[in-house]
Amino acid sequence: FDAVEPASSEAVLKAQLSNSTLPVIGGVAIPSVAINLPIFKGLSNEALLYGAGTLSPTQKMGEGNYALASHRAQSPDLLFTPLDDVAIGATIYITDLENIYTYTATSTVRVQPTDVYLLDEVAGRKMITLITCGEMGGVTRRVVQGDLESVTPVADATDEMRAAFNMEQRTF
């Protein structure tokens, strides 16, 4: 996280003008709060302005503690800002474009940036961890965690799953 810059106007302009191609590896959607974002490999500033980035280069969807981060924005509906409104029991979908992994939110907390234990693997648990700044300026972190409920091939996706990934993507 040390190399990640706050979501400033300068950072947005720099990302919009950069020629970098972002490595899209999938998507994350939380219908109850209208989150639908691409997932990029890694935590570059550009990735966090246009979607969610993976915290570990070796993590795999549906295994262990799959962790994603994205920016908080001034606008309440951009990027991971809506994580504040995720309720326990909410459905969280991620996809690697081959399967859709369905998680159920089990906790939502605000923690200190040093509380990295939330990224640890938990024996026997397949989970997701979603992280954003707790407020503009990043004094704390908002963390939503959930447990894996099912894995569905994309070809067998339900109408609800398809609708989640067809929602508007709200990024910079």
State where each predicted segment sits.
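Solvent-exposed, non-transmembrane regions of membrane-associated and secreted proteins
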Residues: 1-172
